[in-house]
């Protein structure tokens, strides 16, 4: 549980940077996003020194898959899809994006901060909602805001990973501090428990 969608996105991008450095030796990482991706990805790029490669959207305001394939290179650590994008409410082609990422052994983050708690129920109502989650083998992480259509209190979101191996790189630890072991799963060290508790209650 994070403080909001921006922190969920920042944590995910920091995770990919550290994963790529440790597992692939990438020192000059880049991420590929559509021009409609949330501004938090710009913030992550600046904070964590990740080059942000922006690709245009197509006539339906969805990430252009051909453009994405042209710019991905050996330093690409993650490609990003939005479900939906904030500017236009368009769902990027997650199935195609994630499969391309899987074939190229890079991460695929789905920003479902806006639609994460809408699209599953829209599908149940009969709307043609495509798969956007871990049912797709190439999706490696997701962000979804509980404080939007999850109706939790303002100030909560979640970031999810396909497995523990990737999630491990989100954590910050210091083992040689005279004060003892320090470990933090998010950016804040001390956090109020009330928001997490009310989020849990809303989910029930």
Specify the residue positions occupied by each region the protein language model found:
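Short acidic, glycine/serine/threonine-rich loops at helix termini
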Residues: 11-14, 42-47, 90-93, 118-125, ...
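Active-site nucleophile and cofactor-binding loops and adjacent substrate-binding regions
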Residues: 1-6, 33-35, 82
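Substrate-binding/gating loop at the entrance of the active-site cleft, primarily
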Residues: 32-49
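Conserved beta-loop-alpha segment that forms the PLP phosphate-binding cup at the N-terminus of a helix
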Residues: 1-25, 40-44
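Active-site phosphate-binding strand-loop segment of PLP-dependent enzymes
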Residues: 63-112
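Active-site C-terminal subdomain of aminotransferase-like
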Residues: 124-204
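Active-site-proximal loop/turn and secondary-structure-junction residues that shape catalytic pockets
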Residues: 37, 85, 114-116, 148
């Amino acid at each position: 549980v994070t403080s909001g969608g921006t922190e969920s996105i920042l944590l995910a991008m920091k995770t990919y940077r550290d994963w790529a450095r440790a597992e692939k030796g990438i020192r000059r990482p880049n991420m590929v996003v559509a021009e409609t991706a949330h501004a938090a990805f710009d913030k992550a790029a600046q904070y964590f020194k990740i080059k942000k490669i922006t690709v245009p959207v197509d006539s339906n305001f969805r990430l252009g898959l051909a453009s994405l394939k042209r710019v991905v290179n050996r330093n690409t650590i993650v490609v990003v899809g939005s479900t939906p994008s904030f500017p236009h409410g368009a769902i990027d082609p997650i199935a195609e994006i994630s499969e391309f990422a899987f074939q190229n052994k890079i991460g695929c983050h789905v920003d479902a901060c806006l639609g994460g708690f809408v699209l599953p129920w829209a599908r149940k109502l009969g709307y043609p909602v495509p798969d956007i989650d871990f049912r797709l083998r190439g999706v490696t992480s997701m962000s979804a805001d509980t404080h939007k259509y999850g109706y939790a209190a303002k100030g909560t979101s979640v970031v999810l990973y396909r497995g523990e191996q990737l999630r491990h790189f989100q954590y910050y630890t210091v083992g040689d501090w005279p004060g003892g072991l320090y470990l933090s799963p998010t950016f804040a060290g001390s956090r109020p428990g009330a928001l997490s508790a009310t989020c849990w209650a809303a989910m029930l």
